[in-house]
């Protein structure tokens, strides 16, 4: 087996290093898996990841968010809890964020180079601002808003 040294492999190595340095296991694992796939016979499966990866990731994320409700760790509020201003605001923010993320997915597909910038920004936010790396889709949606794509 020979290693393919190209700009994508170099970018994945840089992301891997940045992920380790910023203690961001999401970036570290993602970059490592993709680097291994690119450098081995698994490269033939990359188009499947490209086609279904975001959808599968959103499904897994949704399962993770809903599981405390199903396990009983989070209780549904009674009816009066749904009519408070805080609940109305939280529902509105949820709708806005979901809409923004929905606008971000097409932008990421149309201009994949922007994904690199979003990832670098996410890594900086995690490493230096105490952020959490859950926002690339929303970040892409906000970027689409700024770029006038919405």
UniProtKB/Swiss-Prot annotation:
Keywords: Cell membrane, Membrane, Transmembrane, Transmembrane helix. The keyword Transmembrane helix applies. GO terms for cellular component: plasma membrane. It is a multi-pass membrane protein. It holds the Pfam family DUF441. It is found in: Cell membrane. The chain crosses the membrane at residues 1-21, 52-72, 81-101, 123-143. Its main location: membrane. It comes from the Bacteria. InterPro entries: UPF0756_TM. Belongs to the UPF0756 family. HAMAP family: UPF0756 (MF_01874). This is UPF0756 membrane protein CGSHiEE_06715.
């Amino acid at each position: 087996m020979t290693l393919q040294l190209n700009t994508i492999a170099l970018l994945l190595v840089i992301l891997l290093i940045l992920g380790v340095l910023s203690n961001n296991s999401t970036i570290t694992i993602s970059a490592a898996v993709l680097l291994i796939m690119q450098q081995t016979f698994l490269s033939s499966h990359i188009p499947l990841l490209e086609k279904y990866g975001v959808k599968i990731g959103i499904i897994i994320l949704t399962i993770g968010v809903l599981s405390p409700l199903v396990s009983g760790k989070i209780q549904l509020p009674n009816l009066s809890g749904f009519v408070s201003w805080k609940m109305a605001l939280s529902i509105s923010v949820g709708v806005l964020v979901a809409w923004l993320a929905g606008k971000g997915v097409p932008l990421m597909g149309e201009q994949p180079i922007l994904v690199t910038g979003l990832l670098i920004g996410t890594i900086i936010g995690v490493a230096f601002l105490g952020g959490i790396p859950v926002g690339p889709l929303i970040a892409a949606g906000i970027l689409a808003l700024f770029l006038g794509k919405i």
